[in-house]
């Protein structure tokens, strides 16, 4: 159907020989989204074209180990991350997203940097009640040990250069994966957690975030 996306999955041997299944239907809401096309300084033929759609109502079911996890389209949300491009060989990318409700109003954000040259455009944005509120540069401050390794499970500080997005991120899970095929490698840390802080809309309205996921 138009403006809908369906995800169906059968993942055999997901964990301990057990199968995970999923059937989820996401609806694209009538609201703003963020879309950027950015180059790389070191290679003008490389580019990244990307769209993020937040606050998508999602309904359906995920089953694992005999237990059903039900998603209710009246309260549960998803995000669509869609990208295409010709990328350079070596990259670091920081990305954060959220879709929830604040005081009953759809709220979300998309934050990212490090992947392509963002000097001309960023993907940093707040979504509130269907409208996008653009942010300037954002940085994730993650603690490190004495060897320079990131402590991903320690609290992070997230801050925007315009002062309109400030928060403390408390991790609860680090889904990490390191794949090395010699000619290509990937070192991923997909960290889930709670964020507490403030987000300021274009008209100066300050929104309080408390333990949003």
What are the roles of these predicted feature ranges?
Residues 1-213:
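Structured soluble/peripheral alpha/beta segments that form catalytic or ligand/cofactor-binding pockets
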């Amino acid at each position: 159907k138009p403006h809908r996306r369906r995800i169906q999955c059968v993942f055999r041997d997901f964990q301990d020989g057990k199968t995970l299944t999923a059937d989820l239907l996401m609806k694209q809401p009538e609201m703003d989204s963020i879309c950027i096309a950015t180059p790389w300084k070191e290679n003008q033929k490389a580019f990244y074209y990307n769209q993020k759609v937040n606050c998508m109502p999602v309904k359906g079911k995920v089953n694992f180990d005999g237990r059903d996890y039900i998603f209710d389209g009246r309260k549960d949300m998803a995000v669509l991350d869609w990208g295409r491009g010709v990328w350079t060989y070596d990259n670091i990318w920081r990305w954060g997203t959220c879709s929830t409700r604040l005081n009953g109003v759809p709220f979300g954000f998309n934050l990212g940097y490090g992947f392509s040259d963002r000097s001309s455009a960023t993907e940093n944005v707040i979504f509130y009640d269907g409208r996008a509120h653009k942010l300037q540069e954002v940085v994730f401050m993650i603690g490190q040990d004495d060897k320079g390794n990131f402590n991903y499970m320690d609290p992070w500080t997230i801050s925007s250069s315009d002062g309109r997005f400030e928060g403390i991120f408390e991790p609860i899970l680090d889904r990490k994966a390191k794949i090395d095929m010699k000619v290509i490698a990937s070192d991923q840390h997909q960290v889930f957690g709670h964020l507490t802080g403030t987000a300021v809309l274009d008209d100066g309205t300050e929104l309080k975030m408390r333990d949003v996921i």
